[in-house]
From Swiss-Prot:
EC annotation from Swiss-Prot or TrEMBL: 2.5.1.-
Domain of life from the UniProt record: Bacteria
Binding annotation for carboxy-S-adenosyl-L-methionine: K61, W75, K80, G100, D122, P123, S124, V149, E150, Y169, R284
Database matches in InterPro entries: CmoB, Mo5U34_MeTrfas-like, SAM-dependent_MTases_sf
Species of the source: Campylobacter jejuni subsp. jejuni serotype O:2 (strain ATCC 700819 / NCTC 11168)
Protein name per its UniProtKB record: tRNA U34 carboxymethyltransferase
Keywords: Transferase, tRNA processing
Example GO molecular function: transferase activity, transferring alkyl or aryl (other than methyl) groups
Assembly with partners or alone: Homotetramer.
Length: 291
């Protein structure tokens, strides 16, 4: 029912109609990938594209370049993608899901590695509309579902590779989320996951009081040992740390495309190693887990 309701709201959204009008123009478009997702249409319909893009703010993941229009997103998402890029050969000719896919930036980037099928899950109408705007021009075979991680066990397909980036700390039951990821895998499937974490040798997690880095829906920020235990409890047998990285103001920052605050406003102005609440400043661990 939730999917049907979201799908109905999405299809009735006025910007969806505008994107469909743009799509009907069937503009010739050169699609290329660098740090940004690049679309060249010889500036056809540029006024319409700019107007839709502005109405779809905030743009979190990217960047995107459409002719002379540069959508300078809050996150320089190529930084995260480049951390995972050495492992992207694992998606070649595989059935791949991106859970919490936002506007599809990572999926567009994954096309370079020739997945057999690429499906994004995110129950956000705005992010889906951003994806539809880009894909109206790019014309890729990527599929986008207005679904969440909890829908994976009952989904019609199982996946060889699942990406779940920046989701688990938003879940009040992280072990159930990991079990849902596991239930969405084919035999010998693999999950690539990243989360914020705390530096601690103990098997513990930070439970923020009300907000973490001014974000209200952060439930648990685990140590790496605690994260490993979560994965084992969910039934994963292999756990590999691929990288760790502190989030800095080069990777996440305020731009004209978000109309709100960003990382610089979320840290202690006197000590950038702390959040405004006094917790450790955000840093991320990237892992690969297998069943």
């Amino acid at each position: 029912m939730q999917e049907n309701l979201l799908e109905k709201q999405f299809l009735n959204h006025p910007l969806y109609a505008k994107i469909q009008e743009l799509k009907a123009l069937n503009l010739a478009c050169n699609f290329s990938l660098g740090d940004s997702v690049n679309l060249s249409t010889n500036s056809q319909a540029k006024d319409e594209i700019l107007a839709i893009a502005k109405e779809l703010k905030p743009w979190r993941k990217g960047p995107f370049k459409i002719d002379d229009l540069f959508i300078d997103t809050e996150w320089q998402s190529f930084i995260k993608f480049n951390i995972l890029k050495p492992f992207m050969n694992e998606i070649s000719q595989k059935c791949v899901a991106d859970i919490g896919c936002n506007n599809g930036y990572y999926m567009f980037k994954m096309l370079e590695f020739n997945p057999a099928k690429l499906i994004g899950f995110d129950p956000s109408i705005k992010y889906r509309l951003q994806f539809e705007l880009i894909n109206a021009l790019a014309k890729t075979p990527i599929k986008y579902e207005l679904l969440g991680v909890e829908d994976l066990p009952s989904y019609s397909l199982k996946f060889d590779v699942i990406f779940c980036l920046g989701v688990i700390y938003h879940r009040s039951d992280p072990i159930k989320m990991l079990k849902d990821l596991k239930a969405g895998l084919n035999k010998n499937g693999v999950v690539f996951l990243d989360t914020m974490y705390i530096e601690d040798e103990r098997e513990i997690a930070l439970v923020p009081n009300k907000t973490y880095s001014k974000i209200p829906n952060i439930y648990f920020v685990p140590s790496i040992s605690a994260l490993k235990n979560w994965c084992e409890r969910a039934g994963f047998k292999e756990f590999e740390v691929l990288a760790t990285k502190k989030t800095d103001e080069n990777e996440q920052r305020k731009t004209e495309w978000i109309d709100s605050f960003s990382l610089e406003n979320f840290l202690d102005p006197k000590d950038k190693n702390l959040t405004i609440e006094g917790y450790e400043a955000p840093k991320r661990v990237y892992i690969r887990i297998k069943i």
